[in-house]
Amino acid sequence: MTHLQAGLSPETLEKARLELNENPDTLHQDIQEVRDMVITRPDIGFLRTDDAFILRFLRARKFHHFEAFRLLAQYFEYRQQNLDMFKSFKATDPGIKQALKDGFPGGLANLDHYGRKILVLFAANWDQSRYTLVDILRAILLSLEAMIEDPELQVNGFVLIIDWSNFTFKQASKLTPSMLRLAIEGLQDSFPARFGGIHFVNQPWYIHALYTVIRPFLKEKTRKRIFLHGNNLNSLHQLIHPEILPSEFGGMLPPYDMGTWARTLLDHEYDDDSEYNVDSYSMPVNEVDKELSPKSMKRSQSVVDPTALKRMDKSEEENMQPLLSLD
């Protein structure tokens, strides 16, 4: 076992070996294989390439080097293309803070029987007058950044339960194509988390309709892990034991305290340690080629082309028409 695996229990170490192809004897070599690919994408600013960071992506892609690198590249590319989302990427940002306080997301105290963290969302809690859907997405991404620092969760992953009770048609009409695309790209395509299940409960017909629209844009693996339970909580309990669920999901525990996870982040004033802004990319363009040469590349060094960091042109964005019209 290397120091990079020090945070794993013996059971999780064995799981990483069997399910993720993680081998302590080749771990540093695996990490370096991914790091060496950085020079193939000079258009992307890789703000972190240290061992522990790259290891998250290897675990998320079962130690397939190219797939891990592609996820790493998409992670930073997503942030470059959506700079405004990450300008004030911290728990004390007003929009993120309010979303967190309303339980976007929540995190249950107990892990499931596979050692996965259970995230919960109560969709109707969204207060449209105080924060946006983008703020909710930012709060979720920030929370995942904090949680994924736990090596146990890098291996075991997460499950998500979304309760759609009392989520109105008016709220659903705000889910525009561009908003849904932003969420899919940020969570499915650009983050090193393993999601073992996404469970919808108490969803109305218009959420079924929305899911039908976005389903073709989901990866096959993602589609297989989405469960639409409706009002049948027994089917949820077959996959997540009621002993660890709050009463809102027919569980045996007290009602969930929406502010639990918010207090955790705010107590630590958690923020992402990377500033995603144009000013932070200060390497002169004429030095990029020199810095990208294999001889000058160091372990854990990242090289940035400042010309790659541009906001998406408004004309390139999808239209903001709602998928569900109130007319």
Swiss-Prot record:
Residues found modified as Phosphoserine: S325
Cellular compartment(s): Golgi apparatus, trans-Golgi network membrane; Early endosome membrane; Cytoplasmic vesicle, Clathrin-coated vesicle
Predominant location category: Golgi
Keywords assigned: Cytoplasmic vesicle, Endosome, Golgi apparatus, Lipid-binding, Membrane, Phosphoprotein
Matching PROSITE patterns: CRAL_TRIO
Tissue-wise expression: Expressed in brain with no expression detected in non-neuronal tissues (at protein level).
GO molecular function: phosphatidylinositol bisphosphate binding; phosphatidylinositol-3,5-bisphosphate binding
Gene3D superfamilies: Alpha-tocopherol transfer, CRAL-TRIO lipid binding domain, N-terminal domain of phosphatidylinositol transfer protein sec14p
Region of interest (Disordered), residue spans: 288-327
Domain of life: Eukaryota
A GO cellular component annotation in the UniProt record: early endosome membrane
Pfam families associated with the record: CRAL_TRIO (PF00650), CRAL_TRIO_N (PF03765)
Coiled coil: none
Membrane topology term: Peripheral membrane protein
InterPro entries, A to Z: CRAL-TRIO_dom, CRAL-TRIO_dom_sf, CRAL/TRIO_N_dom, CRAL/TRIO_N_dom_sf
Domains (record comment): The CRAL-TRIO domain is required for targeting to the membrane and for binding PtdIns(3,5)P2.
Note, other: Binding to PtdIns(3,5)P2 is not required for localization.
PANTHER family linked to this entry: ALPHA-TOCOPHEROL TRANSFER PROTEIN-RELATED, CLAVESIN-2
Role, per record: Required for normal morphology of late endosomes and/or lysosomes in neurons. Binds phosphatidylinositol 3,5-bisphosphate (PtdIns(3,5)P2).
Subunit description: Forms a complex with clathrin heavy chain and gamma-adaptin.
Official protein name in the record: Clavesin-2
Species of origin: Rattus norvegicus
Gene assigned in the entry: Clvs2
